[in-house]
């Protein structure tokens, strides 16, 4: 079932607002980490002993610190992911059924843009959230956006959408998620 123009406009505004809010939250928390952890000389703060800490880290690599010092590659990759997510957002059929898919694309865009801003203006990504309980790699708000969106996207693809239903990336014309038959 297609949505009304008004509903579509609301989804677009909500998506744009969500991306902007997530990017602002990411950049603000990174700036707070920079000022309160790095500049103060502390480097870390314990929030919940044995569970959650804030640890300042300048990540010059990819996810979880892999592939260090490949800045041009990471800038290109983050820009490509952002562009691909926006294109997918645009191509998602106008139906409430695909709202979760739009949320995934918005989250991927926000996360990619948040870390892209760091790479362009700092030359590295600020990571600061550390779950000491499980010794998980240090991460940031943008990483949360990407990870949650990718996880939800995987769940949607495996359990919600049927085979062929997500051909929206390769097909032109159809806006309701159903194959168009010609001839």
Where are these regions (language model features)?
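Alpha-helical transmembrane bundles and membrane-interface segments of multipass inner-membrane proteins
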Residues: 1-183
